[in-house]
Each structure stands twice: as structure tokens, then as C-alpha cells.
């Protein structure tokens, strides 16, 4: 035995993962039942073995907001629900580049262009598609961040074009388990999401696909979602925690239906089931974890985060995120974007500091007022 927590189930799973065995649903459920401290310790060992000792930060821009025809029950941007958010069409590619440059200055290693719609269609909206391609090229050519995108469903042709343009990761979350998906979404199927992931991967892009925890799913659903992602093969697994938005079908609850301990255990199990992926803590962490708790997932297998603001809700500053990473005894990834963490922390102590997403909101408001 390479490492012993004193917990036979955890120690056995650690050894098998180190030996290259892919753990299955039975393993995931058994691990989820173990005490959190021992489970987190085992997951942390796997992170140290398979990862590089850094936490990888990504940032996003809400490049097209609201009026989405899909009915995802958690989403403030669905046209089916009255949530009061600002809506706007696809941003000018130069504005997206500006947001990417701010993300670069804030230490992001990758920058995601995100749209609120079922899919950016080359055939049905060619002008918008051309703007997407132009934005990808600008970020690719004029920054050091890796350019990612979340553009909804893709055809095979669209996936091949995006891959040829150098898109690094394609994000398309599965949100939850196959069993629970229809409780949250009715306008498309779980398999629709999987088809897009398979097309993106077949075209040569890496996959970023994950879940939202605390929507009423069971612990078994959380494991089942991770098993589905094993079959797809993801290199980045974002873990969102529900931040209920008033006006959505699940917006009337006060908080996500997951405790801090359950969250930590789920992240640890995801490390066991996806030992070589970036397990990335993303939306909802600030409202579901106290400031002095946010380092805990990074002591339980997590090694990535989304920094700055989210699509329609505020995040915390990149300086705060760097301090959380350091509190966990880790350091920010600087492989693609060799930034100075101390400079980021110093700059964001100023009240005038502006993250990429904050700046985008200014752009969006300006467009709405025209």
C-alpha cells in the first residue's frame, strides 16, 4: 500500500487508481459513504500524484445574454422565465478581446466565450457565426490565454471548424445525471448534450463538461453524472453549486440542497473517478461556502476554478481566489499565461479594480441603452 488513511475502502481505491484502474459506480457510491476527512485525504493524494501542484484558473465572458429558447430550470437566461436580467445579442468581437485581456491580466489561463442559446448556428445565423470565429481568432492571436467556448449544440461541420481555429476546450455541461435531467430540462434531452460532446471530441477539442450540485438530485445522481463523464472523456470537470435565481422553477429555495460536507465529499469522489482531469470549482461557491471554507475543496482533490464573475451573478475578485489557492498550500497555474500573482493581489485591493466579467456588463448595458 502506497498510502494509508486508515480507511480500507479509501486506501484500496487510492491504490487501484494509482495502478491505472478506472473506478466504477460501485466504487463511487462506496467512497461517498466514507468519512469526509479520510476521503479528502485520499483524493488529495491522487491530486498530488496526477496533477502538477497548481490550481488552473479560467474566466468567461457572457457573449450573448438572455432570451434562450431552452427551459433549463436553474437558468436565469431562459426566455421561459421572468428573472429580470439584462439581455443583449452577441457582443462585438473587439469587446470580447478586451474582456480576454482583462482576464489575462487577472491570471486566467483560459478564457471561455459563452452564449445563451441552444446553439450558435452556422447555417441559420451566419453573421453571428462569423462574429464567433472572429472573436476566437482575436483572443487566440492577441493574448496568451487559451481560448475556449460554450456555444451550445454543434454539428459535425461546426465542431471541425472550431477545432481548426484552435479552440482548446469545448464546454457543454451535462448538469446532472441521466435519471434526474428531465426534472430540470424538457426542451432537449440528455443524449442531445452527449452528442455535442462526442462531436467536439471527435473533431479534436478537449472537453470541459460538468454538473450543478444542489438542484434536488440524490447523492447517487452525483456519482452517476461523473460516470457518464467517464464514458465521454473530459479533461476539465466543472463543479457548480446551485445559486438559486428568483423567477426560475428552482429559484424559490433559499440555498442549494447540498451541505458543505456533501460538497467536499462529492468533489473528492470526482477526483477518484477522474484522477487525471482538472476538477474545477465554479459557480455558486461564494454563496455556498463561507470565505474561510473555500480552500477546503482544494484540500479534497480540486485543482481548478473559475475566477471573476459568472454569467449573470457576481463572483469574487481574482485576488481573493489567489489567496484561497495559497491557503490550500497550492499555487496558481502559470503555464500559458505567466502572470505575477502578487501584482494581481495588489491591483485588486483598489476599489476601481475591474474583472473581465464586470467590464462585459458595462458593455452589455451600453448596448441595451442604444
From Swiss-Prot:
UniProt-annotated binding residues for [2Fe-2S] cluster: 208, 280
Assembly notes: Homodimer.
The protein's Enzyme Commission number: 2.8.1.6
One Pfam family of this chain: BATS
InterPro entries noted in UniProt: Aldolase_TIM, BATS_dom, Biotin_synth/BioAB, Biotin_synthase, Elp3/MiaA/NifB-like_rSAM, rSAM
Region named Disordered: 328-370
A GO molecular-function descriptor: 2 iron, 2 sulfur cluster binding
Keywords annotated in UniProt: 2Fe-2S, 4Fe-4S, Biotin biosynthesis, Iron, Iron-sulfur, Metal-binding, S-adenosyl-L-methionine, Transferase
Cofactor dependence: [4Fe-4S] cluster; [2Fe-2S] cluster
Record's protein name: Biotin synthase
Gene Ontology annotations of biological process type: biotin biosynthetic process
Pathway(s) served: Cofactor biosynthesis; biotin biosynthesis; biotin from 7,8-diaminononanoate: step 2/2
Domain of life (superkingdom): Archaea
Comp. bias intervals (Low complexity): 352-370
Record's catalysed reaction(s): (4R,5S)-dethiobiotin + (sulfur carrier)-SH + 2 reduced [2Fe-2S]-[ferredoxin] + 2 S-adenosyl-L-methionine = (sulfur carrier)-H + biotin + 2 5'-deoxyadenosine + 2 L-methionine + 2 oxidized [2Fe-2S]-[ferredoxin]
NCBIfam families on file: bioB (TIGR00433)
Name of the encoding gene: bioB
Radical SAM core domain boundaries: 50-276
Family in the record: Belongs to the radical SAM superfamily. Biotin synthase family.
Binding site for [4Fe-4S] cluster: 68, 72, 75
Functional description taken from the UniProt entry: Catalyzes the conversion of dethiobiotin (DTB) to biotin by the insertion of a sulfur atom into dethiobiotin via a radical-based mechanism.
Top class in the EC scheme: transferase
Cofactor binding remark: Binds 1 [4Fe-4S] cluster. The cluster is coordinated with 3 cysteines and an exchangeable S-adenosyl-L-methionine. Binds 1 [2Fe-2S] cluster. The cluster is coordinated with 3 cysteines and 1 arginine.
Amino acid at each position: 500500500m502506497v498510502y494509508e488513511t486508515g480507511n480500507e475502502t479509501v486506501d484500496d481505491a487510492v491504490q487501484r487508481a494509482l495502478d491505472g484502474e478506472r473506478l466504477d459506480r460501485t466504487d463511487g457510491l462506496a467512497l461517498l459513504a466514507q468519512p469526509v476527512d479520510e476521503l479528502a485525504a485520499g483524493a488529495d493524494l491522487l491530486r498530488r500524484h496526477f496533477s502538477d501542484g497548481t490550481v488552473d484558473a479560467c474566466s468567461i465572458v457572457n457573449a450573448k445574454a438572455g432570451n434562450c429558447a431552452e427551459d433549463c430550470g436553474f437558468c436565469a437566461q431562459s426566455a421561459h422565465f421572468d428573472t429580470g436580467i439584462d439581455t443583449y445579442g452577441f457582443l462585438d468581437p473587439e469587446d470580447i478581446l478586451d474582456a480576454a485581456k482583462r482576464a489575462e491580466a487577472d491570471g486566467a489561463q483560459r478564457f471561455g466565450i459563452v452564449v445563451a442559446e441552444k446553439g450558435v448556428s452556422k447555417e441559420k445565423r451566419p453573421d453571428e457565426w462569423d462574429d464567433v470565429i472572429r472573436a476566437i481568432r482575436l483572443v487566440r492571436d492577441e493574448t496568451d490565454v487559451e481560448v475556449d467556448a460554450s456555444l451550445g449544440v454543434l454539428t459535425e461541420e461546426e465542431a471541425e471548424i472550431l477545432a481548426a481555429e484552435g479552440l482548446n476546450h469545448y464546454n457543454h455541461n451535462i448538469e446532472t445525471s441521466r435519471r434526474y435531467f428531465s426534472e430540470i430540462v424538457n426542451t432537449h434531452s440528455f443524449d442531445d448534450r452527449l452528442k455535442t460532446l462526442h462531436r467536439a471530441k471527435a473533431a479534436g477539442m478537449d472537453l470541459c463538461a460538468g454538473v450543478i450540485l444542489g438542484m434536488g438530485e440524490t447523492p447517487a445522481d452525483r456519482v452517476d453524472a461523473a460516470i457518464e463523464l467517464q464514458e465521454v472523456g473530459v479533461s476539465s470537470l466543472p463543479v457548480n453549486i446551485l445559486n438559486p435565481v428568483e423567477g426560475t422553477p428552482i429559484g424559490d429555495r433559499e440555498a442549494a440542497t447540498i451541505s458543505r460536507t456533501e460538497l467536499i465529499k462529492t468533489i473528492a469522489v470526482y477526483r477518484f473517478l477522474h484522477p487525471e482531469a482538472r476538477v474545477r470549482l465554479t459557480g455558486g461557491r461564494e454563496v455556498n461556502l463561507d470565505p474561510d471554507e473555500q480552500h477546503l475543496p482544494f484540500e479534497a482533490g480540486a485543482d481548478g476554478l473559475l475566477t471573476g464573475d459568472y454569467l449573470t451573478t457576481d463572483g469574487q475578485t481574482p485576488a481573493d481566489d489567489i489567496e484561497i489557492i495559497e491557503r490550500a498550500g497550492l499555487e496558481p497555474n502559470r503555464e500559458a499565461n505567466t502572470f505575477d500573482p502578487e501584482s494581481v493581489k495588489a491591483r485588486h485591493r483598489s476599489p476601481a479594480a475591474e474583472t473581465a466579467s464586470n467590464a462585459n456588463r458595462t458593455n452589455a448595458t451600453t448596448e441595451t441603452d442604444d
